[in-house]
Amino acid sequence: MSETSADADVDTTIDRSVIRSPHPDVEIPDVSLYDFLFASLDDDDRGRVALVDGPSGATTTYGELRDRVDAIAGAFAARGLGPGDVVALLSPNVPAFVAVFHGLLRAGITVTTINALASGREVAKQLGSSGAKALVTVSALLPAAEAGADAVGMAAADVVVLDGADGHPSLGELLAGGHAAPDVTFDPRTHLAVLPYSSGTTGLPKGVMLTHRNLVANVVQTEAYLPLTRDDVIPAVLPFFHIYGMTVLMNGAIYQRSALVTLPRFDLAEYLRVVEQHRATVLFVAPPIALALAKHPAAADRDLSSVRILMSGAAPFDEHLAEAVAGRLPGTRVLQGYGMSEMSPVSHVIPVDRTDISPGTVGLLVPNMLARVVDPATGEAIAQPERGVSAPGELLCAGPNVMVGYLADEQASRDTLEPDGFLHTGDIVTVDADGAFTVVDRLKELIKHKGYQVAPAELEALLLTHPEIADAAVIGVPDPESGEVPKAFVVRVEGSALTAVDVQDFVAEQVAPYKKVRVVEFVDAVPKSAAGKILRKELRAR
């Protein structure tokens, strides 16, 4: 994994079209993520609870966590892995995820996190694309892990199963060697820390190259508006493999020495039990969880009075839902943020002390961020108004948290990153005189299902492998519980008796559950432009 430039050369010439964060710039330490999070650990910190395993209640202190991180770094270095290597991590939210993630980074290894719901086919794609030399997983996900590893020729000895499985090394076996953490040095501005996969504004999933500085910067930027405390208790149900869970929950909590209660999956009853039993104070959620808290009768039967902040992200969160949540959680600040994997991920947050900003907005630019709003039809800049709200336009952002680019995809990188360092988000926004942004539409084709990204192009390519499908197109259609669901428009080959259930089953066997096609409509032809581009607007208008 080669090193590359992390901070874009953003043109800071005075320009009325450039919108700046109203918050003064914050200092970003020029250190590795490990040093940023763990170097200042003092004796008092060492005894504080860092992690609680939600199902069992087992605890890990900050001292134990750092010792485990160092030991894991030594174990993987002893296997010949270090700077320039990529290791994949396929795991739900368990305490070991945190230790392994930071142990790998401590050794200078780049981590590519894989969705815990991924199929074997999807695991293989990411292993191959990222060039991963090893895979770390848990026994519950071993079938997908083994299928993916076998497909790319990865040896069983390179598939580490944290809790043990026949034929694979376990974490305990790796740590038995007692190897000290390696002495590695690298430039945090250029050394790649993580490779999460994102579809960006369009197309197939791509490796997002994020440096140590990107991740450090975004923790500091977010903390300016959403300060956590040493006394906060945070249920961690949003997956750590997703950039939101990785940066805002995991790294943000460690930075402030808060306690994380890990939950491997979302189950409303279990989530409510954890909030009540552990007196949770801050909830980071996606809109489907917020909806459950607002509407489900089970939430009314629990004591949730300890919650002081609820922050929603990963998908649109309207003002009506925010009001419903606030009604169920009196005294709780209900906030919203915005971001994307390519920004590590946070670019906007409603500051916790700005009660004047509507929770239906995504808030203000975080410190050290610049933005432009551009008319997508003309390319003309739309200025922030002196009063009222601007016309809608595409949001572009620049800052120290913006990715280097996409792994091995120069064209996609050029399409997404402007030469002056501004990133195309593909989202249509307005901005008001106070600097609050509201997302009003999406240029990009991605489907947002329960906060997960679903790329239509990926499902279309899969559908076209079916021998009885002549052509196909996929769009997202509104769904009150999940935000959007994938709908497939399918052209059958002549004489085919293919049914909607056949199509749904074909896709379901090969993708993660959130990518399943939920609606199928058979059509005579898929509408396309003269250049062959699918006319999704026509499909949405049907």
PLM region spans:
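ANL superfamily adenylate-forming
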Residues: 15, 58, 143-189, 199, ...
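Conserved pre-ATP/AMP-binding loop-to-beta segment of ANL
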Residues: 30, 47, 166, 179-197, ...
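Conserved AMP-binding A3 loop
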Residues: 59-63, 193-217
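AMP-binding/adenylate-forming catalytic core of the ANL superfamily
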Residues: 118, 135-137, 283, 399, ...
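Conserved AMP-binding/adenylation subdomain of ANL enzymes
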Residues: 216-233, 241-282, 296
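Gly/Ser/Thr-rich phosphate-binding loop
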Residues: 280-284, 296-357, 370
